[in-house]
Amino acid sequence: MAPPSIFAEVPQAQPVLVFKLTADFREDPDPRKVNLGVGAYRTDDSQPWVLPVVRKVEQRIANDSSINHEYLPILGLAEFRTCASRLALGDDSPALQEKRVGGVQCLGGTGALRIGAEFLARWYNGTNNKDTPVYVSSPTWENHNGVFIAAGFKDIRSYHYWDAAKRGLDLQGFLNDLEKAPEFSIFVLHACAHNPTGTDPTPEQWKQIASVMKRRFLFPFFDSAYQGFASGSLEKDAWAIRYFVSEGFELFCAQSFSKNFGLYNERVGNLTVVAKEPDSILRVLSQMEKIVRITWSNPPAQGARIVARTLSDPELFNEWTGNVKTMADRILTMRSELRARLEALKTPGTWNHITEQIGMFSFTGLNPKQVEYLINEKHIYLLPSGRINMCGLTTKNLEYVATSIHEAVTKIQ
């Protein structure tokens, strides 16, 4: 008798919620269906959008006979790393001028977070330090917890961020948690367009946050997934990162180019490292090279080439910023329109938070039962947390979504 499969006892894992939601949406035959869960930009026709500047650069790359398919260096395409870090920090960054910045090309924002987490688990404060507390916001993007756990960190904690009652930032709770955190703890910070709440600190609030972190020697690890995409301004969306650098912080910044270039399946990311001295950067990158070597060995080239060529050419750069603003402006319009319709319907509660939030997502305040009603009765797909992707709204479905939310809030408590 043959022995049972060595895989017989492997348990079935739960599906990734946001991807399961999209699969359910696709299988739904109802013509009214709306997908507000997908984490990607959509046009007013509910279609993916390839940025015109990306099409142009892809064509140029295809026609460039000097390009081959040799391995990139382990740390990635040099021009991409330089351009990406400069985008985050600004051309006039003192850290760049003093050559104490390094970049590592990674597989999207998740890859940048993972390489940063793996490095910190091995070398933070010069030692293997997996007992260091890592703080993530409550709520946060679900991958933040998983990435740091997978890197070996044993103490993942949450810090206050969202005030459900006022549907805004719990600044005092945030500051209190910073004060109570052990010195040298790691804090994962959303650079802009906080996921899932869409609520960001103001510059003055960021200054308060930085002041406590500086005094208590807390390490900032920024996640920058939406630069330019949140407000339409590259500078505004990078304000917090640049302020922390100006205050003398050493920090990591995981950058994603999925949203602001529409390069979701190219997995284009960069980990920007800011240190106090140039020598530190050389040593840090030498260790990150070892980590990358055993993780994916060498990164893919196509997406990095597209981003590098666009960011390094003034004409293409200007076209790209225009494309990004087109996306950001459509999201802002959908926010205004949804709020206006809910208020016109006199939907119970307050809805000003929809326009006060920023970026792709809105934390609506809908409870899980109301979400269940919207999915089952109205075929409107969103996450149980009540988070919606504003890009899923269009001029064609806005009225239906607003009246459905009104119905859910009115009927279901």
Curated annotation (Swiss-Prot):
It is an enzyme of class 2 (transferase). Its cofactor is pyridoxal 5'-phosphate. Its main location: cytoplasm. L-aspartate binds at residues 39, 141, 195, 387. The keyword Cell membrane does not apply. The keyword Amino-acid biosynthesis applies. Keywords: Amino-acid biosynthesis, Aminotransferase, Cytoplasm, Pyridoxal phosphate, Transferase. The modification N6-(pyridoxal phosphate)lysine is found at residue 259. It catalyses: L-aspartate + 2-oxoglutarate = oxaloacetate + L-glutamate; L-cysteine + 2-oxoglutarate = 2-oxo-3-sulfanylpropanoate + L-glutamate; (2S)-2-aminobutanoate + 2-oxoglutarate = 2-oxobutanoate + L-glutamate; 3-sulfino-L-alanine + 2-oxoglutarate = 3-sulfinopyruvate + L-glutamate. InterPro entries: Aminotransferase_I/II_large (IPR004839), Asp_trans (IPR000796), NHTrfase_class1_PyrdxlP-BS (IPR004838), PyrdxlP-dep_Trfase (IPR015424), PyrdxlP-dep_Trfase_major (IPR015421), PyrdxlP-dep_Trfase_small (IPR015422). One of its GO terms (biological process) is cellular response to insulin stimulus. Its EC number is 2.6.1.1, 2.6.1.3. Pfam families: Aminotran_1_2. GO terms for cellular component: cytosol. It is found in: Cytoplasm. One of its GO terms (molecular function) is L-cysteine transaminase activity. Homodimer. Belongs to the class-I pyridoxal-phosphate-dependent aminotransferase family. In eukaryotes there are cytoplasmic, mitochondrial and chloroplastic isozymes. Biosynthesis of L-glutamate from L-aspartate or L-cysteine. Important regulator of levels of glutamate, the major excitatory neurotransmitter of the vertebrate central nervous system. Acts as a scavenger of glutamate in brain neuroprotection. The aspartate aminotransferase activity is involved in hepatic glucose synthesis during development and in adipocyte glyceroneogenesis. Using L-cysteine as substrate, regulates levels of mercaptopyruvate, an important source of hydrogen sulfide. Mercaptopyruvate is converted into H(2)S via the action of 3-mercaptopyruvate sulfurtransferase (3MST). This is Aspartate aminotransferase, cytoplasmic. The lineage of its organism: Eukaryota, Metazoa, Chordata, Craniata, Vertebrata. The gene is GOT1.
